[in-house]
């Protein structure tokens, strides 16, 4: 399963509820973006990062 490299966000499972409160299964997928970053060793690494983490954190991008 896809997972955010920083926050660990993954897919969430739950129910869709109609007006009559009938439940059907649905999923929420994290908004993951492929990003190249420079790690602490100076190596370029391709990782998946959630859009929120990308917005909040100042990463050194390659």
UniProtKB/Swiss-Prot annotation:
Q: Among its keywords, does the record have 4Fe-4S?
A: no
Key words, A-Z:
Ribonucleoprotein, Ribosomal protein
One GO BP annotation is: translation
Q: Which SUPFAM superfamilies match?
A: L28p-like (SSF143800)
Q: One matching Pfam family, short form?
A: Ribosomal_L28
Q: Which GO terms describe its molecular function?
A: structural constituent of ribosome
**A Gene Ontology CC term for this entry?**
ribonucleoprotein complex
This protein's record includes keyword Membrane = no
Q: What family does this chain come from, according to its entry?
A: Belongs to the bacterial ribosomal protein bL28 family.
What PANTHER family does the database record attribute to this sequence? 50S RIBOSOMAL PROTEIN L28, LARGE RIBOSOMAL SUBUNIT PROTEIN BL28A
Q: What is this protein called?
A: Large ribosomal subunit protein bL28
Q: Which organism is it from?
A: Onion yellows phytoplasma (strain OY-M)
């Amino acid at each position: 399963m896809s997972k955010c490299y920083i926050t660990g966000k993954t897919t969430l499972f739950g129910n869709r509820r109609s007006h009559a409160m009938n439940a059907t299964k649905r999923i929420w997928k994290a908004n993951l973006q492929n990003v190249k970053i420079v790690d602490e060793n100076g190596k370029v690494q391709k990782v998946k990062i959630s859009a929120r983490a990308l917005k909040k954190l100042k990463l050194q991008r390659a």
